[in-house]
């Protein structure tokens, strides 16, 4: 949360050779504090700027990145432009950071013309936003795609797409979420009274 988007990009000057980047900072907070109201703010910013850009890259903390990717997938349905979400396990100013790789890869994906919709770009993988889950807090390969293959992989900042994105003739933007929804995992022996 302490770096501005412009400061982040200064660590990765190669991105400027990929595309022209305009930065917008919607909020700066630890991702553990994100709420559905923040997701709606991001979706509204995407809607307001959708016609002006070819793609979007969102820098995000890893603790709730998968939740944000899923929420945005439902708030911005059928997007025909890439909306790439990325972050890092280690801060960008560390020698051993994964931030520079992930940020560059996210911009490669956003500029490729091969991807669309909300995806997580992390550790050389492109994961569909509704299928991503953080499965490891200690590894650079922190995210997994649950019950669905990766959309693409990246090697040396080259994209190799496996699955074509699903798009609609025009994206559908939503601006409401019901915050009174709970995820209840059923296990054998669960008392029906719980529901």
PLM feature segments, named:
Residues 1, 63-69, 99-103:
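Short glycine/serine/threonine-rich phosphate/pyrophosphate-binding segments
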Residues 1-47:
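ATP/NTP phosphate-donor binding region
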Residues 85-155:
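Internal gly/pro-rich beta-alpha loop/helix module
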Residues 59-81:
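Short Gly/Thr/Asp-enriched flexible loops that form oxyanion-binding sites at enzyme active sites
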Residues 4-15, 128-195:
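Accessory alpha-helical/coil subdomains and C-terminal extensions
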Residues 54-55:
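Structural motif
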Residues 45, 68-74, 192-194:
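Short, charged beta->alpha transition segments
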Residues 24, 86, 184:
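Hydrophobic residues at beta-strand termini and immediately following loops
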């Amino acid at each position: 949360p302490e770096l501005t988007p412009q400061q982040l990009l200064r660590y990765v000057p190669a991105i400027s050779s990929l595309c022209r980047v305009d930065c917008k900072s919607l909020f700066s907070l630890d991702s553990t504090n994100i709420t559905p109201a923040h997701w709606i703010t991001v979706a509204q910013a995407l809607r307001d700027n959708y016609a002006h850009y070819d793609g979007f890259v969102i820098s995000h903390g890893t603790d709730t990145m998968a939740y944000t990717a899923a929420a945005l997938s439902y708030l911005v349905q059928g997007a025909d432009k890439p909306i790439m979400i990325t972050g890092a396990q280690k801060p960008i100013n560390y020698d051993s950071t994964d931030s520079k790789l992930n940020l560059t890869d996210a911009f490669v994906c956003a500029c490729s013309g091969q991807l669309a919709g909300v995806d997580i770009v992390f550790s050389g993988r492109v994961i569909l936003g509704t299928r991503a889950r953080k499965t490891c807090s200690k590894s650079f390969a922190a995210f997994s795609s649950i019950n669905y293959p990766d959309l693409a992989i990246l090697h040396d900042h080259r994209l190799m797409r496996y699955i074509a994105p699903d798009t609609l003739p025009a994206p559908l933007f939503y601006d409401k979420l019901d915050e009174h929804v709970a995820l209840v995992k059923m296990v054998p022996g669960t008392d029906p009274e719980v529901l």
